[in-house]
Amino acid sequence: KALEKTTMVAGEEVVPEKEAKDEKTVANGYFKDADVKDRELSDYTGEWQSVYPLLKDGILDEVFDYKAKLNKDMTAAEYKDYYTTGYKTDIDTINIKDNTIDFVVNGEHHQYTYKYVGYKILNYEKGNRGVRFNFETDDAGAGRFKYIQFSDHGIAPSKAEHFHIFFGGESQEKLYNEMHNWPTFYPASLSEHEIAQEMMAH
């Protein structure tokens, strides 16, 4: 019920919010190269939950309905398909502390120590850009978690409110090509409805 209320209230503000999404802001991917700064793993410190289970359980259907009405570029079903591909992951939670990242998959912990290795600015087809902040571990047993990239719509040091993560065992360069699957994590302290509300405001 609370979620339905939020959707209705937000719906009254469709026009100004649509304008806001078109603004050339940093969050929307418009910035100067000189404004991009290196970031520490501490920007991502905390306990994070995957939003993929929420999508599978139908919790985010209200979000897709809202996006379809707001943007009028895809149907709610098309949005759900797009985000199903984007959010898909077998990682349940990610815990980040100091220089370590602990990936929890089906109750099993995969924890490694990481170092920052720089950032990459990516140009997107629609004219905006994004920044991936790259980390890697020297642990020989890290497998698919050797190379890590964070994207949280920020370009300089600041605490992430949520993030998309890219990972693999081959190279950072290979991960730059991944544009369709971006597992997404929100603070573990947020409820399902709080996450849905954050998404509608995003």
Q: For each predicted feature, which ranges?
A:
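Calycin-type beta-barrel ligand-binding domains and close structural analogs
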Residues: 3-35, 96-202
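N-terminal helix-cap/turn-to-beta initiation motif at the start of protein domains
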Residues: 31-47
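Helix N-cap and loop-to-helix transition residues
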Residues: 40, 75, 191-192
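Beta-strand cores of secreted/periplasmic/IMS beta-sandwich domains, seen most often
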Residues: 42, 47-53, 93-96
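Sec/Tat-exported extracytoplasmic proteins
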Residues: 45, 52-59, 86-87
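Generic short beta-strand segments
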Residues: 49-56, 100, 106
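N-terminal glycine/threonine-rich, aromatic-flanked beta-hairpin/loop signature
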Residues: 61-115
